[in-house]
């Protein structure tokens, strides 16, 4: 059994008379301390660099060493880890035994703790060596934060600079007191803060030790936005941002339009990750997404060309979708995009002329990321299950890095090979089972999310035929196309369906028990076929 709690009344309002400040980021701390001291005559206690900053501003500050009677030692590693500090943070003021211990040991309660921690994650991101990173693991700060948060009945704890103003407003409202509600909220934020800090430390140790599956795995993020609802109106939703420095929806700036919904964020992320497969230094590329699946993807001489080719694939599904671009949105492409209803445009940047065109559509959201994510970069993906979390590394295999194997009698032509590689890039981002028909560096038919591969092949061909009819063409778009499959063909039927649709070449991972049967069928149909050796399931 754990510790048995004592039942003492918790005051609704508690006066702030004594405050301890120990901050790594000094932003705003002088003005905050000045307001507290000038308005409420609060006694100020501080440590090291924070004390020097406050003293330099003319504030009367008592160094923590004066309180403890013990100097900072070991290069500042030990300064607040002392009973006179932790007793002041943890003492239950209504408990006679606690009061007796405090009086006997000259412990004076601390009513407000202001701490922000050593910049651990920033130190990692700076490229510092392991020893420097280790030194930037805060010990005393988290210990004090946890102590103060546990004793929120009497002690407030501030861990974020943007809480300074709300604390001053609270004190003004209650004549120098903090309400129980505020102290309780601050405690919750404090424990979330230290949990996130420890999560980052544990993750760094795991990376340093090259442990891919640590015995405990934690994830953290700070609240970025609360949405009106989730995938459906009856579901609650929020977006939390972590510290991964990857260009995308999390780092993007919303230049115009209303706040993004849960589905907007999910679809836009899928769109931008797909278009990032295409190097902006080599080609212009556009991806059109609906329900996290592509309904059109293309490369072109410029973004307008790529957009129109992508739209040709399935202009019905593209209505109300997401448009992702791998280059700066220009005027010509913007003029085409606004011709149909679009939810979101995401691009590395946009010219002023393009922004002016988009601005005419008030509800059209324009996101600017500042760059393109590197598809080769790793990272973790997580999915919650009932009672658990599935974790895997990001699918960061790029077809350019693969050794492709021609397994048929006929070798793909240069144009076919270009289109095969294009189609396989797209198939990586289509929900399984995925079949992608492509021609001239553009998708012409996409079959997604079917339980059988042959159904995906038939649906993709059918949609291509529909698009051709809408465009007034006399022959289907899949004639003379190539086809990509995200996984192997378990039987020859899917490949035969592709051949019947007019495809001339196939790219797939290979690895089926019936590979020879499928290769024989390809040869009989005069198809060229390439194995990649890599599967791209996506669920």
Curated annotation (Swiss-Prot):
GO CC term, one of those recorded: cytosol
User: Which CDD domains does this UniProt record tie to the protein?
Assistant: IMPCH
Question: EC annotation?
Answer: 2.1.2.3, 3.5.4.10
Question: Locate the MGS-like domain: which residues?
Answer: 8-159
Catalysed reactions, as listed in the record: (6R)-10-formyltetrahydrofolate + 5-amino-1-(5-phospho-beta-D-ribosyl)imidazole-4-carboxamide = 5-formamido-1-(5-phospho-D-ribosyl)imidazole-4-carboxamide + (6S)-5,6,7,8-tetrahydrofolate; IMP + H2O = 5-formamido-1-(5-phospho-D-ribosyl)imidazole-4-carboxamide
State any single GO MF term.
phosphoribosylaminoimidazolecarboxamide formyltransferase activity
A single GO BP: 'de novo' IMP biosynthetic process
What top-level branch of life does the organism fall under? Bacteria
Q: Keywords of this protein's UniProt record, alphabetized? A: Hydrolase, Multifunctional enzyme, Purine biosynthesis, Transferase
Matching Pfam families: AICARFT_IMPCHas (PF01808), MGS (PF02142)
Instruction: Respond yes or no to whether keyword Transferase is given for this record.
Output: yes
Q: In which pathway does it act?
A: Purine metabolism; IMP biosynthesis via de novo pathway; 5-formamido-1-(5-phospho-D-ribosyl)imidazole-4-carboxamide from 5-amino-1-(5-phospho-D-ribosyl)imidazole-4-carboxamide (10-formyl THF route): step 1/1; Purine metabolism; IMP biosynthesis via de novo pathway; IMP from 5-formamido-1-(5-phospho-D-ribosyl)imidazole-4-carboxamide: step 1/1
Its domain comment says: The IMP cyclohydrolase activity resides in the N-terminal region.
Q: Which PANTHER family match?
A: BIFUNCTIONAL PURINE BIOSYNTHESIS PROTEIN ATIC (PTHR11692:SF0), BIFUNCTIONAL PURINE BIOSYNTHESIS PROTEIN PURH (PTHR11692)
The UniProt similarity line reads: Belongs to the PurH family.
Q: What is this protein called?
A: Bifunctional purine biosynthesis protein PurH
Q: Give the species this sequence originates from.
A: Bartonella tribocorum (strain CIP 105476 / IBS 506)
Write the gene name: purH
């Amino acid at each position: 059994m754990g510790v048995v709690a004592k039942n003492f009344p918790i005051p609704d309002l508690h006066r702030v008379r004594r405050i301890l400040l120990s901050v790594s980021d000094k932003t705003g701390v002088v003005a905050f301390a000045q307001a507290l001291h000038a308005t409420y005559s609060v006694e100020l206690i501080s440590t090291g660099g924070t004390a020097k900053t406050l003293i330099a501003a003319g504030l009367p500050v008592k160094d923590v060493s004066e309180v403890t009677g013990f100097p900072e030692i070991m290069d500042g590693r030990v300064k607040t880890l002392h009973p006179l500090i932790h007793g002041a943070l943890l003492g239950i003021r209504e408990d006679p035994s606690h009061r007796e211990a405090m009086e006997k040991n000259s412990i004076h309660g601390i009513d407000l703790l202001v701490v922000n921690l050593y910049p651990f994650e920033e130190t990692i991101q700076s490229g510092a060596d392991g020893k420097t990173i280790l030194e930037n693991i805060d010990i005393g700060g988290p210990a004090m934060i946890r102590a103060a948060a546990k004793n929120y009945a009497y002690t407030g704890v501030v861990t974020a600079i943007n809480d300074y103003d709300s604390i001053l407003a609270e004190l003004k409202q209650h004549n120098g007191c903090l309400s129980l509600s505020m102290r309780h909220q601050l405690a919750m934020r404090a424990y979330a803060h230290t949990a996130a800090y420890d999560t980052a430390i544990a993750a760094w140790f795991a990376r340093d030790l090259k442990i891919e599956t640590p015995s405990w795995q934690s994830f953290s993020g700070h609240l970025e936005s609360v949405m009106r609802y989730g995938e459906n109106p009856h579901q609650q939703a929020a977006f939390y941002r972590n510290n991964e420095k990857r260009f995308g929806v999390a780092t993007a700036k919303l230049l115009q339009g209303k706040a993004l919904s849960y589905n907007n964020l999910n679809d836009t992320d899928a769109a931008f990750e797909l278009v990032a497969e295409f190097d902006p230094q080599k080609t212009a590329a556009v991806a059109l997404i609906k329900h996290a699946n592509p309904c059109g993807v293309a490369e072109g001489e410029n973004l307008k060309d790529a957009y129109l080719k992508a739209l040709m694939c399935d202009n019905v599904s593209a209505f109300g979708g997401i448009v992702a671009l791998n280059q700066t949105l220009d005027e010509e492409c913007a003029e085409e995009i606004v011709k149909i209803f679009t939810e979101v445009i995401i691009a590395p940047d946009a010219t002023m002329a393009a922004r002016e065109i988009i601005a005419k559509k008030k509800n059209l959201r324009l996101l600017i990321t500042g760059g393109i994510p590197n598809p080769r970069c790793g990272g973790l993906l997580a999915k919650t299950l009932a009672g658990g979390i599935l974790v895997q590394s990001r699918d960061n295999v790029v077809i350019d890095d693969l050794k492709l194997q021609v397994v048929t009698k006929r070798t793909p032509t240069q144009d076919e090979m270009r289109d095969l590689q294009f189609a396989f890039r797209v198939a990586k981002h289509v929900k399984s089972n995925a079949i992608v028909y492509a021609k001239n560096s553009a998708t012409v038919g996409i079959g997604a999310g079917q339980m059988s591969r042959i159904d995906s092949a038939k649906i993709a061909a059918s949609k291509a035929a529909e698009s051709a009819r809408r465009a007034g063409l006399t022959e289907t778009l899949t004639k003379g196309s190539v086809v990509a499959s995200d996984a192997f063909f378990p039987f020859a039927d899917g490949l035969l369906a592709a051949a019947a649709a007019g495809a001339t070449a196939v790219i797939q991972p290979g690895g089926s028990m019936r590979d020879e049967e499928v290769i024989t069928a390809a040869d009989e149909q005069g198809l060229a076929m390439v194995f990649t050796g890599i599967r791209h399931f996506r669920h």
